[in-house]
Design a protein with these regions (language model features):
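N-terminal amphipathic alpha-helix/helix-capping segment at the start of soluble metabolic enzymes
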Residues: 1-14, 20, 99-100, 104-116, ...
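Metal- or metallocofactor-binding catalytic centers and their adjacent structured scaffolds
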Residues: 27-102, 398-403
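Metal-dependent enolase-superfamily TIM-barrel catalytic cores that perform enediolate-based chemistry
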Residues: 117-245
């Protein structure tokens, strides 16, 4: 059995927000890679990996579950974003090693394929209804069957200018204001327009990004019921998940939730009480393949489907880990798409192929994806990577922050 000899990190993308874990073994040429990317705390993730690495040196790389449990408890306090990310990156790398050692793709080790390809949904957006319609039609022509629809940025449709908002005389200088009532008016109008123009052929989704107050969130879910969404995403923040009981009592609009989840006690009640229809944990924030396959199995018995979170700040390795889970899981529902630049694809040979609304894995052993370290490091802009990044703040008229 191969033994772990070193754990390395490769920081890449222009802003340095991608962290790729590389686990080396005592068998020549046998290593695995995983995703430990964090858009806002990449340097913290790297430091944590360096702290945990001595615990794992000399361990059997095939003892994946045991190593997962060791990392989970090694700092006593657990279930936090950084630790989960570190845990996930190492876990993916160990599954990659296991697959290479066995000579088969990871999805085969997880029980074999339950489908030939992974259906993905596209991200359509526009600053006005016509631009959004055009973008939706473009994705339909590309073959996508499920398309997310947004009016501009997250919260779009709910932003009003300072004059409309009637800011207090001592306001803090914010010029763009998020208003719940504007959102409740404009998003149903958006879907009414799209259904009138496109009919009910395309399956449509929308991401609230947790911008609404809970009672208004319930109202929105009810207002969107006539438009038969594929799902309504992140209607409520993790702190307010108990409101999903009221959402379920009030309407049948399918709910997708979990992008910010890091703790089992966030997703477990929503799944076991059937309060959501899709769970959207990010594989690299949910503890990796080992833990996310357990989430997928739990979903299977309660009629909930998976929709692992991807989006623009994820990397090709995390995407590939999600694809392996999707292929092997009977509770799979849909996979969020992710587009990368040509030079980013070039740095990750063997990446998943996105075509016609489907993601395709390859038949190579392990995850089937590798990292070209020279090309990956060439993507890094040292000046940009030295900066700190923070989640953008949206505010209400009185200056209070809207939780993203």
């Amino acid at each position: 059995m191969p033994k772990i000899t070193a754990i390395q990190t490769i920081r890449t993308r222009a802003a340095g927000t991608w962290v790729i874990v590389k686990v080396l073994t005592d068998q020549p040429g046998l290593y695995g890679i995983g995703s430990a990317s964090d858009h806002y705390r990449a340097k913290t993730v790297i430091t944590t990996i360096e702290t945990i690495a001595p615990l794992l040196i000399g361990r059997d790389a095939g003892h994946i579950e045991d190593i997962w449990q060791s990392i989970y408890t090694c700092g006593y306090w657990r279930n936090d974003s950084i630790l989960n990310t570190v845990q996930a990156g190492i876990d993916m790398a160990l599954w990659d090693i296991k697959g290479k050692e066995a000579g088969m793709p990871v999805y085969q080790l997880l029980g074999g394929p339950t489908r030939s390809a992974v259906m993905a949904y596209a991200h359509a957006a526009g600053d006005d209804l016509q631009a959004l319609e055009d973008d939706v039609r473009r994705y339909m022509e590309e073959g996508y069957q499920v398309i997310r629809c947004q009016l501009g940025p997250y919260g779009g449709g709910g932003f009003i200018d300072a004059e409309q908002a009637r800011l207090p005389k001592n306001h803090w200088g914010h010029s763009r204001v998020f208003d719940d009532e504007a959102y409740l008016e404009n998003i149903p109008k958006m879907f009414a327009y799209l259904r009138e123009k496109l009919g009910f052929g395309p399956k449509l989704t929308h991401d609230v990004h947790e911008h609404l107050q809970p009672t208004n969130a319930v109202t929105l879910a009810k207002l969107l019921e006539p438009y038969r969404l594929f799902f309504l995403e992140d209607l409520l923040p993790p702190e307010q998940i108990h409101w999903y009981r009221l959402v379920r009592q009030q309407c049948t609009t399918p709910q997708a939730m979990g992008e910010l989840f890091i703790n089992p006690h966030e997703w477990m009640p929503l799944i076991t009480e059937r309060l959501i229809d899709f769970v959207r944990v990010r594989v690299s924030k949910g503890g990796g393949i080992t833990n996310c396959r357990k989430i997928a199995t739990l979903c299977e018995w309660f009629g909930v489907r998976t929709a692992w979170q991807e989006g623009g700040d994820n990397d090709p390795v995390n995407q590939m880990a999600a694809v392996h889970l999707d292929l092997a899981s009977s509770s799979f529902g849909i996979q969020e798409e992710n587009h990368f630049r040509p030079e980013e694809y070039a740095a990750f040979p063997g990446h998943a192929v996105l075509e016609g609304g489907y993601l395709y894995a390859n038949e190579q052993p392990g995850l089937g994806i590798d990292v070209d370290e020279d090309q990956a490091r060439a993507l890094l802009d040292p000046e940009l990577a030295a900066r700190s990044f923070y989640m953008a703040e949206d505010r209400r008229a009185d200056g209070s922050i809207v939780r993203p």
